[in-house]
Amino acid sequence: MVWQLKERYKFDWNRIFGKDAWHIEYSITDKCNRNCAACSHLAPLSKRPNFVSKEEFEQVTANLNRCLPDIHTFWLTGGEPTLHPEYISLLNIARHLYSEAYIGIYTNGTTLRKFEQDEWFWQFIKDNGIVWGVTIYNGEKRYIEELFDKHDCLNNLAIVRNGSSFTNLTNYSKGQEVSRKKYEKCGWERRKINVRNGKIFNCPTCEFADLFNEYFNESLKVTEQDYLIVNDLLTKEQVEEFKNPMPFCSQCNLDIRYKRL
């Protein structure tokens, strides 16, 4: 079966904030090859790769597909997901489980150079309709556009953002309020399902708090009410009801959210 894209994937944050069907973001590694300020996934703090196994990925994704079959896009993310030694196999698994959805990978694009002459790679991307959501650094937009165009894969390229500036996204601070008003103000994309280590989180701030704790020897608390375990018992209703203020919100301060660094 061929899933070639008939038109270019349109990346729009406004849709993801609340208009699309679900977007699933599955973190397959904590490792990254950049050291970006204010990384929302705290990748610069990671001390180990935390590569998801193919077995766990397939089991978790199958359960997600059972609960949420009608999603918009299934994304691999990290860290830098292309550092996972089996990320192409994971894309293939996701493609066959979510045969009617878009399948994508968020990346900084730095590993694409080694595939410049790899025709099998580009044919796989094209035939499986794999979307590359690329953040552009160091003025490489032209190179990335030309690379995808050269291999007839321009429909598979989505420029996510310009990585030339950074804004504050995470500010851990205990004793904060937990309220519907704060939750609505928070701004994390409400149509996203954040998945890591077999669990669903409402936001990366909670999802990657363990990296902060380990790096700084801190004690942010993630309770059983702050995540859902993805297993055979998970239901669509649980996922939908989960999109509400969580106990972890008491450890997050929004006062400097989105301020430029």
Predicted regions: what is each one?
Residues 2-105, 112-116:
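Conserved alpha-helical substructure of the radical SAM core
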Residues 6-11, 153-162, 255:
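Amphipathic, soluble alpha/beta structural segments
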Residues 54, 84, 141, 242-246:
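Generic detection of long, well-ordered alpha-helical segments
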Residues 61-62, 117-121, 235-237:
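A generic local structural motif
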Residues 83-197, 201-205, 211:
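Conserved AdoMet/S-adenosylmethionine-binding subsite of the radical SAM
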Residues 171-261:
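Accessory C-terminal segments flanking Radical SAM cores
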